[in-house]
Amino acid sequence: MGTPKSRLRLTREAWLAQALDILADDPEHLRIDEIASRLGVSKGSFYWHFENRSDFVRSLAEFWRDANTQSVIDTLKQQVGTPEDRLYVLMRLLVEQKAAQYDLAVRAWARHEPEIAPVIREVDELRLQTLRGLFADMGFEEPELSMRTRTFVIAHSFNHLLTVGLSRKEALEQLEARHAFFTRR
């Protein structure tokens, strides 16, 4: 027998995951009352997990960093195989996790929340270092190494806009074509 929803105590991570989804889908609804409503709890639950709005804003940016960057990097570190194989794993993870949608939403939100700029800079640096390492492991050298790294980031950031309406099969075919493009010498 399940616990009634009203008696469940949500975790801080549940609040943050719901907030990130709202931010990506409908940023104008990123409000405490809307998050609480979607979680089926009162606003009081919010203040159990967050001291104030600033704590929430900072925590959401850090949650985004951890969920969409650090966890991906940690997964890559556990992968065996060639650098090309690891790049393919990275590309699949990014597509499956809606990473680009979350990234665009958080970056747009940062225009109104300047205190999250340091987290965004940290994420950018972590991602560039990781990609640079993968491409260097494939044997690419400067200046192509830097250009390939930055081009990958740009291409991936906007790719989801070009794949709207594609079947899963078509999306995977395009992913494979992009992978071949980025690993080609």
Per-region residue spans from a language model:
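N-terminal intrinsically disordered/low-complexity leader segments
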Residues: 1-10
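Solvent-exposed, amphipathic alpha-helical segments
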Residues: 18-25, 71-75, 106, 155-159
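Hydrophobic alpha-helical connector segments
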Residues: 59, 73-100, 148, 152
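Amphipathic alpha-helical segments used for helix-helix packing
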Residues: 97-118
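Hydrophobic/aromatic-rich alpha-helical bundle segments in the mid-to-C-terminal region
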Residues: 117, 121, 136-185
